[in-house]
A protein has these predicted regions:
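Eukaryotic scaffold repeat domains enriched in small/polar residues
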Residues: 1-255
Length: 255
């Protein structure tokens, strides 16, 4: 692995790693044993990977401004965006350095977080037909400052990691603002565990990025765990960044 930017798990518990390296998509079993890899020389800058109920794989390339959907065998189903063509910064048009896809399991519609040079979430149907978008630059409700990651819960609600606003915003399926979780440190990724009676939410937080806080504690990088009402249940990673067990550098993807 070079930079493992995102990770997903399919229905047979295979771990799919999106890697910035010679082998961009690497698949392991649940014990970490290498199984296979594919799509060499396809991606410019791997950023976010997601899997739907049929084990189709969505790969977001922030370098060439594309979203690609593959079947479980790695065959391309469709591509959104054209390599080398980026929408004008903050134009609101897809795509301007997109980051992640989230699939609504109840409808198979999906959402694209867009991203570094836009302040939008775009919604598409399962065939890649554009439906609508929402969001704008800012710090208010429904506004974004780097739409860095996105996920959905068992009811189809949409959770957006609004990284530089240090929060997670929650929307319904029509893009209507519902709520937000604050007191986060650069919320970079979010995973919703839907296997139990109640959804559990894992939020990866970056280090604050301020040199004077290099030795600070409980500022990130860390993983915060919430219930559906936004109650903090636990946190992993109390110390500053580092290689030892229980510490992180930059939690960029969770599954």
């Amino acid at each position: 692995l070079s930079e493992a930017t995102s990770v997903a798990v399919n229905s047979v518990d295979e771990i799919i790693v999106y890697n910035r390296g010679t082998k961009p998509i690497i698949i392991f079993d649940k014990e970490g044993n290498y199984l296979r890899s594919w799509e060499e020389n396809t991606f410019s800058n791997a950023h976010g990977i997601s899997v739907d109920n049929s084990d189709n794989i969505y790969c977001v390339d922030s370098g060439d401004n594309t979203v690609r959907k593959f079947d479980p065998s790695g065959n391309l189903i469709f591509q959104l965006g054209k390599e080398g063509e980026r929408s004008e910064k903050m134009s609101g048009l897809p795509f301007a350095v997109p980051t992640q896809v989230a699939v609504d399991e109840s409808t198979n519609d999906f959402y694209v977080a867009d991203g570094y040079s836009n302040a939008k979430v775009h919604k598409y149907d399962e065939n890649g037909k554009y439906l609508f978008s929402w969001g704008e630059s800012g710090t208010g409700e429904g506004q974004f400052n780097i739409v860095h990651n996105i996920s959905t819960d068992s009811e189809g609600l949409v959770y957006v990691a609004d990284r530089e606003n240090h929060r997670v915003q929650i929307f319904d399926q029509e893009g209507k603002y519902i709520n937000q979780w604050i007191n986060l440190s650069r919320a970079a990724c979010i995973y919703v565990d839907k296997r139990g009676k109640e959804d559990i939410f894992y939020v990866g937080e970056y280090f604050s990025g301020i040199a004077s806080n290099d030795t600070g504690t409980d500022l990130g990088p860390r993983i915060s765990i919430f219930n559906k009402s936004g109650k903090l249940l636990s946190r992993l990673g109390k110390e500053s960044y580092g290689p030892s067990v229980g510490r992180f550098y930059s939690p960029h993807g969770i599954c």
